[in-house]
Amino acid sequence: MASYGTIFSAILPVFLVIATGMLFHRRGWLSEETETGMMKLGMNLLAPCLILSLVPGNPALEKLAAAGWAIGLGFVLILGGFLLAWGAGLVGGMRIGSGLRTFTISAGIQNYGFIALPLLIDLFPGNEGPSGLMFIFGIGVELAMWTAGLAILTGKAGLRALVNGPFIAVILALVLNYTGVHRYIPDVVHTSMDMLGRCAVPMSIFMIGATMGRFLREGIFTDALRVGLSSVIVRLGLHASLILAAAFYLPLPEDLRRLLVVQAAMPAAIFPIVLARLFNGQPRVAIQVVMVTSVVSLVTAPFVIAWGLGKLG
């Protein structure tokens, strides 16, 4: 079983890169044009290349059922997270118009992607199963976010936004995988995609920090104790327990179980901050959820992952 120290050593560099991105933005070393360009580069080139280098031919996706489980759980577990967050928000005194909607979509969804990915790579060297499944799992997460999540925030879904570079890359990667066409891709093409894809992880983590830095404003700590405590209870307590229960008790492939254990330990996702800003939510609530769960998960995540992987054997 991986020890607390081993897992903490894998997590700490991720948070240091996030802190670096936040520092660069707060110091004004990232212009808005540079930041936008980096995000477009990651979304439209680097992330798709990473997906196309990890998914086709991945042993964990040998059976179609593995992809079905991953997508289905990504969707259902996020719906469960939204329900738990809505209930906890009501208990915590939040109401529609005072942050309940934003809290629900923020605390109800974990950072499933580029914070989890380096941990999966580090914890399972030589095994690309959990890493490849993460992107398939992400289809379900994104589907839940752009349907139920956006409906909670605005009253209507936004499926058009679901069709982006990574989504298209996942669909293409699954087609290549299950048709066997990936075997005929020249090595030079695969090597090039792998090189570009490896750039996606550090740059995306850096940009997570930059995005967090962008939304840090005066007054950000107003009502932070109530929101922060509620978010920890939901994201790192109730929702984490739901994800772990799925990992332990459903008839899942082993690599998907491992992925879920890591997912359970993750802090809240950062993208709801952007959604709250774009769709007249309350970005202050979203950034409080992200900041507090990120700090707390730095301590709790190694315990959760070590215990969860130990229980899986």
For the regions a language model picked out, list residue spans one by one:
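Alpha-helical transmembrane segments of multi-pass small-molecule/ion transporters
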Residues: 1-313
